[in-house]
């Protein structure tokens, strides 16, 4: 057991200021609400807080096609009508709209996950958190499901520089299809996704029979669930599967995507999980004492997203939080009871004991085929992308500092961050 985990937390106020559109369910403003709730509970004083670097196009192209990345850089609301063919090719439109500062938004959330992975690789922390990340649907050459750049894949690729095997766990209500697809043919990443499946629910993939191919056969695990699963059923299944996966696969690091749309009463969800039930997964994964990268994901009832990720930040810090939400810039959103925890829902649970048992049996049977962790011929670890040495005397105050200089500027108080009352607030 580690005596006390060292936590790195990544946040940039600009990431929550973008606007997908008036009727779009994705509200990045939820990230500002989460951050201010974390501040209100004083959790920032127990972590190392960093502003992430903006991911470079060359970093994004470690997974995504250069043409797609270049188009994301070029497109904006004013010129999008000039590129109807490219818009269709890259799946940009209603679900994945073009909005102001789209590429910078992608740079910030992807940069946070890449930075988190690098700090873990360099043993500068035990746990790294980027609630802005977790956009698991993005594909190599196109956007999907409100996701443009797949930060999770980029983070896992970083972790693979130092770890023979990485375990990816996804508790979003939607199948983690983009991450699974990226690593479907390799045994160096095991993907485990717990999600709603059936009834034409997006993205339509994630059947228990989808297990990977070639070298990756049996290294993709899908746990397809029906409407209404509750805390006890979900947590029992989660503990059984994840404990067996860790025992057999022996990962060097874990990436945990904590999509909050699996909570009860989510605008797009259909599960009955309480915040305690959702957070129990985080608590369980933390107990393995492996390098852990934690991200956000879906979540479309924004006040509950903020509640959930604040509670889970507390769990990662071994800090119990009082249920009464303290005063903060977004306090009005938590009316009328101003409680941190929300209970489970009351949708009929269609996941019968026999159904859950059959899913569990199939998954555990597949795991028998990989009783021994795969052996990996390790090559020389490639360096992180080159960032020029920082000369403090030559630093331009009008230009955002690079990652190395920002690492010297760790802050433990509120004033580091853009707030609604600041003159330069977003």
UniProtKB/Swiss-Prot annotation:
* Gene Ontology biological process terms, A to Z: chromatin organization; negative regulation of seed germination; regulation of leaf senescence
Naming one, the record's GO cellular component terms include: cytosol
InterPro entries assigned to the protein according to its UniProt record, in alphabetical order? HDAC_PDAC, His_deacetylse, His_deacetylse_1, His_deacetylse_dom, His_deacetylse_dom_sf, Ureohydrolase_dom_sf
Primary localization class, coarse: nucleus
The note on cofactor binding and number reads: Binds 1 zinc ion per subunit.
Residues binding Zn(2+) are 172, 174, 261
Residue ranges for the region (Disordered) are: 383-426
Q: Where is the composition biased (Acidic residues)?
A: 415-426
Give the enzyme's main class according to its UniProt record, as a single word: hydrolase
The record's comment on protein family reads:
Belongs to the histone deacetylase family. HD type 1 subfamily.
Quaternary structure (record): Interacts with AHL22. Binds to farnesylated ASG2 in the cytosol.
Listed name of the protein = Histone deacetylase 9
Q: What is the lineage of its organism?
A: Eukaryota, Viridiplantae, Streptophyta, Embryophyta, Tracheophyta
């Amino acid at each position: 057991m580690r005596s006390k985990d060292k936590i790195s937390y990544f946040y940039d106020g600009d990431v929550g200021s973008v606007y997908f559109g008036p009727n779009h369910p994705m509200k990045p403003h939820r990230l500002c609400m989460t951050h201010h709730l974390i501040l209100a509970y004083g959790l920032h004083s127990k972590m190392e807080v960093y502003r992430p670097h903006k991911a470079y196009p060359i970093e994004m192209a470690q997974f995504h096609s250069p043409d797609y990345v270049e188009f994301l850089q070029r497109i904006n609301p004013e010129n999008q009508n000039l590129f109807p063919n490219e818009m269709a090719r890259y799946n940009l439109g209603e679900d994945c709209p073009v909005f102001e500062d789209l590429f910078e938004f992608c740079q910030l959330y992807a940069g946070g996950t890449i930075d988190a992975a690098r700090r873990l690789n360099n043993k500068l922390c035990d746990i790294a958190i980027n609630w802005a990340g977790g956009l698991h649907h993005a594909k190599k050459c196109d956007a999907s499901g409100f996701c443009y750049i797949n930060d999770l894949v980029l983070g896992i690729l970083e972790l693979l520089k130092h770890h023979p095997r990485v375990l990816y766990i996804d508790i979003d209500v939607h199948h983690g299809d983009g991450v699974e697809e990226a690593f479907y043919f390799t045994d160096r990443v095991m993907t485990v996704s717990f999600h709603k499946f059936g009834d034409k629910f997006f993205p339509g993939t994630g059947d228990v029979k989808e297990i990977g191919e070639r070298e990756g056969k049996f290294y993709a695990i899908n746990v397809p669930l029906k409407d209404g699963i509750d805390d006890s059923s979900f947590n029992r299944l989660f503990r059984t599967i994840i404990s067996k996966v860790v025992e057999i696969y022996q990962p060097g690091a874990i990436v945990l995507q904590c999509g909050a749309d699996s909570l009860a009463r989510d605008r797009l969800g259909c599960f009955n999980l309480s915040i305690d039930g959702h957070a129990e997964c985080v608590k369980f994964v933390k107990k393995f004492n492996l390098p852990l990268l934690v991200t956000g994901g879906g979540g479309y009832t924004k006040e509950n997203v903020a509640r959930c990720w604040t509670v889970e930040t507390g769990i990662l810090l071994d800090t119990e939080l009082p249920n009464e939400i303290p005063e903060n810039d977004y306090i009005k959103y938590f009316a009328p009871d101003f409680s941190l925890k929300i209970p489970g829902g009351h949708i009929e649970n269609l996941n019968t004991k026999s159904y859950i048992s059959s899913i569990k049996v199939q998954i555990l049977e597949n795991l028998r085929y990989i009783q021994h962790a795969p052996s990996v011929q390790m090559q020389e670890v490639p360096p992180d992308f080159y960032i020029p040495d920082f000369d403090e005397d030559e630093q331009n105050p009008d230009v955002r500092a690079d990652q190395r200089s920002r690492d010297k500027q760790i802050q433990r108080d509120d004033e580091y961050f853009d707030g609604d009352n600041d003159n330069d607030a977003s």
